[in-house]
Amino acid sequence: MTTSNRRYHITTFGCQMNKADSERMAGILEDMGFKFSEDPNNADLILYNTCTIRDNAEQKVYSYLGRQAKRKHEQPDLTLVVAGCVAQQEGEALLRRVPELDLVMGPQHANRLKDLLESVFAGNQVVATEAVHIMEDITQARRDSTVTAWVNVIYGCNERCTYCVVPNVRGVEQSRTPAAVRAEMEELGRQGYKEITLLGQNIDAYGRDLPGATPEGRHLHTFTDLLYYVHDVPGVERIRFATSHPRYFTERLIKACAELPKVCEHFHIPFQSGDNQLLKAMARGYTQEKYRRIIDTIRRYMPDASISADAIVGFPGETEEQFENTLKLVDDIGFDQLNTAAYSPRPGTPAALWENQLSEEVKSDRLQRLNHLVNVKAAERSQRYMGRIEEVLVEEQNPKDQTQVMGRTGGNRLTFFKGDIHELKGQLVMVKINEVRAFSLTGEPIEMRQALPI
């Protein structure tokens, strides 16, 4: 089947890993001759890259699918693809539920999209969910931004948190080689990208599956070593990373972040609960005391560092006292941002089978109370920016005010100021902050710093 005049549309649900996968799959489709369509109803191939972390995200996928499945009866040459974690979890059951589907593919198969589609175009209905070694992707991704980019450094997760479906759907940990990561970053630097976020479901596990050991007995390749190896890539001005696991977060990594000028002083370290009994039930492998020590160590080396995290309320058996321990941790630490969620039972996880599930009313009440505290603490944290001069990397026009541009500080605070996006996009601008809100800032531009060649 010729693809030169065909159009594609990708809808992405879920995490940054999914967004990075979608960019790679878009690059493969364009390499095959497909053109991007903003409107899914004008596309000849529709791909849903799905998330199964929470039930509402999964149900949204089925809602979208239902509309396009009806359309396929009127347009038989429409190609329907479900990728990502729902595809991995459901496999052939998806075909029984939505027989109009052409391709069901798990996240490990993202780089194999061309081969899988060629089988579809040969007349086959394809399910690709078997465990595979992830191939290096030589196709240039179609990036959603021209300023910032994601680079995967490790796929999969070997943890077995009792609430989490990720290891079931993303497979075991597979680290890319340091050379492969640096090569991709160097290409992005040549293309003009200024900020790169290194991605992993559990990024601190990087290198555990790679061969070799140091004379001291540690793994030859660790995430800390990777940061030292890639921090001087020409053209790249900022490096971020996510997501960290408290169980493996080391002082050596913190020291590296403090020493390396391109690494942003922003850490995303989920704690999930502030209660030790619940952390044990979740199989997280640390205590709230250890988590507090990590944050204390970060702030000892980098007093102004921004801290963000994830938290779950309403985990099976959570008592009011245990929930209040979470509130106390949030109140004591003062996060710059906290992603919160009510516990959602996921198929194939131990916690989903436990009998001590909480009511939706209790979960909703606790989520509301936690979110209120999060907003209060974030507003308090924002006060430190008032009157300061912050370096902002300009990314886009403010969609709500065409006279303003927007970007992020090194600490990941969204910042708005007057300016022309055509002049400033991709530039580092010194901005004096004159207005602060819980999760964003506004200021006046002071000067622009051109990115210096190395």
Swiss-Prot record:
Name its species: Nostoc sp. (strain PCC 7120 / SAG 25.82 / UTEX 2576)
Q: Where does [4Fe-4S] cluster 2 bind?
A: C157, C161, C164
Q: Which domain of life is it from?
A: Bacteria
Q: Which residues cross the membrane?
A: none
What compartments host this protein?
A: Cytoplasm
Q: Which cofactor does it need?
A: [4Fe-4S] cluster
Stated EC number for the protein is: 2.8.4.3
Q: What is this protein called?
A: tRNA-2-methylthio-N(6)-dimethylallyladenosine synthase
**GO cellular component assignments:** cytoplasm
**What's the catalysed reaction?**
N(6)-dimethylallyladenosine(37) in tRNA + (sulfur carrier)-SH + AH2 + 2 S-adenosyl-L-methionine = 2-methylsulfanyl-N(6)-dimethylallyladenosine(37) in tRNA + (sulfur carrier)-H + 5'-deoxyadenosine + L-methionine + A + S-adenosyl-L-homocysteine + 2 H(+)
Task performed by this protein: Catalyzes the methylthiolation of N6-(dimethylallyl)adenosine (i(6)A), leading to the formation of 2-methylthio-N6-(dimethylallyl)adenosine (ms(2)i(6)A) at position 37 in tRNAs that read codons beginning with uridine.
The enzyme class is transferase
Q: How is the cofactor bound?
A: Binds 2 [4Fe-4S] clusters. One cluster is coordinated with 3 cysteines and an exchangeable S-adenosyl-L-methionine.
Instruction: Describe the protein's quaternary organization and the partners it interacts with.
Output: Monomer.
Q: Which GO terms describe its biological process?
A: tRNA methylthiolation
Q: Name one GO molecular function term.
A: 4 iron, 4 sulfur cluster binding
Instruction: Report keywords, A-Z.
Output: 4Fe-4S, Cytoplasm, Iron, Iron-sulfur, Metal-binding, S-adenosyl-L-methionine, Transferase, tRNA processing
- Gene label: miaB
- Write down the HAMAP family for this protein, in alphabetical order: tRNA_metthiotr_MiaB (MF_01864)
Q: List the taxonomic lineage.
A: Bacteria, Bacillati, Cyanobacteriota, Cyanophyceae, Nostocales
Pfam families documented for this protein: Radical_SAM (PF04055), TRAM (PF01938), UPF0004 (PF00919)
- TRAM domain residues are 383-447
* Protein family per UniProt: Belongs to the methylthiotransferase family. MiaB subfamily.
